[in-house]
Regions:
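Alpha-helical transmembrane segments and immediately membrane-proximal extracytoplasmic
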Residues: 1-246
């Protein structure tokens, strides 16, 4: 392999630093807050078993992302039958509104809602959280399929964090901090090629220590590898498997 010139790293890094700084300045100027320590997750003593747990959580996160992609493709297929864009948007917006009324935790990007889920997880029924999880993915799919504009990353962080709470409630032996922080970023990490950046998001937003960050990084890697493996397998047997974009 030809050696990579050191100048290329600088050429690639500087625009990213400038873009990230500008984005932070705009976000902080508008929102007046950051994601630092946004989610009050209790700290727990690190165990070597947490590393293996990270693998399992990563695989579970991959399954959630695959289910989301299937929901999106199904909704897009149905929405595509409506030729009039105005009617399609009207129906899509109405359905998103119905979901929001039935499941208020699905409203918005998900930052404040995830904080509420984490803070009240001891009193929220696990099946209600499952309904919220499915409702959020369905609302996102409807938005994407019917012409609404918005990003996927923050809503998928909500999906991941909520899934982590569900995992802990179903399997209490999995530490709360590990389940929430790992699933928080492993779900979007299934398709986003930024494992280090996603791990930092979990560390900074949850306030993890360096040891707890290890299973998070493993979960992100396991999620991405699992998803890539499934996609490669399907493409080997079916030529029409779509690309996954975020």
């Amino acid at each position: 392999l030809a050696p990579i010139r050191r100048e290329r790293y600088v050429e690639g890094l500087l625009p990213q630093l400038i873009a990230a700084t500008a984005a932070f300045a705009v976000f902080f100027g508008v929102a007046g807050s950051t994601l630092l320590n946004s989610f009050a997750v209790p700290t727990e003593e690190f165990s070597a078993w947490d590393l293996l747990t990270g693998v399992g959580l990563g695989i579970a996160a991959s399954v959630i992302m695959i289910v989301f992609v299937l929901i999106v493709k199904l909704v897009q297929a149905v929405a595509g039958k409506v030729s009039n864009g105005l009617v399609r948007g009207l129906v899509g917006g109405g359905l998103v509104g119905v979901i929001a009324v039935a499941l208020p935790l699905t409203v918005g990007a998900g930052n404040d809602q995830l904080s509420a889920v984490i803070d009240e997880s001891a009193t929220i029924n696990v099946w209600l959280l499952v309904a919220v999880l499915i409702g959020k993915m369905l609302a996102m799919a409807l938005s994407l399929a019917t012409g609404f504009i918005g990003g996927n990353v923050l809503p998928m962080l909500f999906v991941g964090g909520t899934a982590g709470v569900i995992v802990h409630l179903i399997i209490p032996d999995i530490p709360y901090a590990v389940a929430v922080s790992a699933m928080l970023v492993a779900v979007p990490g299934a398709v986003i090629k930024a494992p280090i950046g996603l791990t930092f998001i979990a560390v900074l937003s949850v306030g993890l220590g360096p040891l707890t960050a290890a299973p998070v990084a493993i979960a992100v890697a396991a999620s991405h590898i699992t998803t890539a493996g499934v996609v490669a397998f399907l493409r080997a047997h079916r030529a029409d498997v779509p690309e996954v974009h975020t």
